[in-house]
Amino acid sequence: TDMQTTDAFGRPVPITVNLDDYTFDYSLMQDSYTPGNYSQATADQVAALSYACGVSFAMIYGTGASGTYSDSAVVSLKAHFGFPNAQLLDRSTFTDGDDVWMNIIFNELSHNRPLMYSGVDDIWTVGGGGHAFVFDGYDAEGLVHVNWGWYGRNDGYYAVDLLNPRIHSFHNQQDMIIGCESPSQASVRTDTLRVEGEV
């Protein structure tokens, strides 16, 4: 897998990784990394996974921020990470309504399939910036638990229509990647998902 980033002077820097050379020991990866609370082996495993994801997702690295697009991520999840059922859903083109959108989220989370979710903040809409984060649960009130990827800061339960940690509100241009499960866990899927009643 090849990608390209830029150096501090804006010059292109190619990056290549052979994902066949990587094996990941998920049992060594911790849920949280705080200074003095992890070994070199656990740090190496999560660093290797982060690097492989970054390169294969065609991450654009910068000194102030880094990013990629959800469509690049879903292609890589299917091709390189053993998630053949991964699928990208774009809320702006989703025609089945908000209730069905939310039922898809609840269904995925009820089956222990975390969601990669993305949105664009009001303050970044003009410039096109956004943020990707993980939904990993929901509560009885229909709020989703969000891991923002900011060292645990602001992680908690949020309304999907707001997604408003601190000064942000990632309610624009939302999309999500569903179906992140290994083939051995996968159930038979169809092209159209219809949810009726409560999930």
Task: Tell where the protein language model's regions lie, with residue ranges.
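Cys-His-centered catalytic/binding microenvironment captured across papain-like cysteine peptidases
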Residues: 110, 125-129, 138-197
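Intrinsically disordered, low-complexity regions enriched in small/polar residues
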Residues: 24, 28, 35, 40, ...
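Short, Φ-rich (hydrophobic/aromatic) sequence segments
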Residues: 38, 42-65, 104-113, 167-181
